[in-house]
Design a protein with these regions (language model features):
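Proline/glycine-enriched tight loop/beta-turn segments at coil->beta junctions
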Residues: 2-10, 134-136
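Serine-hydrolase catalytic machinery in alpha/beta-hydrolase-like enzymes
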Residues: 6-87
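Alpha/beta-hydrolase fold active-site loops
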Residues: 9, 41, 113, 137-138
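Acidic beta-to-alpha connecting loop that harbors the catalytic carboxylate
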Residues: 17, 48, 145-148, 179-181
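Primarily recognizes the serine-hydrolase "nucleophile elbow" in alpha/beta-hydrolase
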Residues: 19, 79-81, 86-136
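Alpha-helical scaffolding within the catalytic cores
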Residues: 25-34, 74, 102, 120-134, ...
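C-terminal catalytic histidine-bearing segment of alpha/beta-hydrolase fold enzymes
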Residues: 139-142, 154-224
Length: 224
């Protein structure tokens, strides 16, 4: 396999409430997963611990770092077993997984190059600190508009809060309102993967700083 000879990207996928790791295939897209594997990369879609509560990840509604420590261990295992490109470690999450990815982007800024949050962001009680204050990452932040709600959360609001939170701290967000509610439209998945590829670790300034590339999903825009 390509992983045996190439040190490729690592993409974590954190699923939403009532979902499972297999959701990664829909969320990332089969074509994108095949591209990751062809580059010698790995998709890591963890199982959640039922002890996390109603939401599947501890950091989606709390402060315990169990899932971060699992991510650290899985990443170390991938590096040892197949080899990884340390500049191309990414996280993607939907809903509760989007909350987790948003918090993880700061709590693991030491190794995350770029992230994609679908209907995630930060709630009013979240203010994560960076484990690498000098590091800068890029985030593609997507929500489904005013109808993107899962009680008690309005995901447009949480997504915008995350964008504001990271931008003022020097990170690079791109915000997308795809207008299709609490979902991942199939048409955005290629742009999400392109975003991750175009933002390896330390890509500052972003190659998108002066504008999004041609063909990028039209719901997305730079944050002024």
């Amino acid at each position: 396999t390509a992983a045996a000879t190439l040190d490729g990207p690592v993409v974590f996928y954190w699923h939403g409430t009532t979902n499972a790791p297999a959701q990664a295939e829909y969320a990332l897209g089969r074509a994108q997963i095949d591209a990751i594997l062809a580059q010698g990369g790995v998709v890591i879609a963890p199982e959640h611990d039922p002890a996390a509560g109603i939401l599947p990840w501890f950091l989606a509604d709390g402060v315990r770092d169990d899932d971060l420590r699992v991510a650290d261990e899985l990443l170390a295992c991938a590096a040892m077993r197949v080899g990884v490109d340390a500049r191309r470690i990414h996280s993607v999450g939907l809903s509760a997984g989007g909350f987790h990815t948003s918090v993880m982007s700061l709590r693991r800024a030491s190794y995350l190059a770029s992230v994609v949050s679908y209907s995630g962001g930060l709630t009013a009680t979240m203010a994560p600190t960076s484990d690498a204050p000098g590091a800068r990452f890029a985030a593609l932040v997507l929500h489904g508009g005013a109808d993107d709600k899962v009680f008690p959360y309005v995901l447009q609001t949480t997504s915008e809060r995350y964008v504001d939170f990271i931008k003022v701290r020097g990170h690079f967000p791109v915000l997308c309102d795809h207008g299709q509610g609490h979902d991942i439209p199939a048409a955005v998945r290629a742009s999400a993967w392109r975003f991750l590829q175009d933002h390896p670790y330390g890509a500052t300034p972003s190659p998108y700083a002066t504008g999004l590339p041609a063909g990028f999903h039209p719901s997305c825009a730079l944050v002024p």
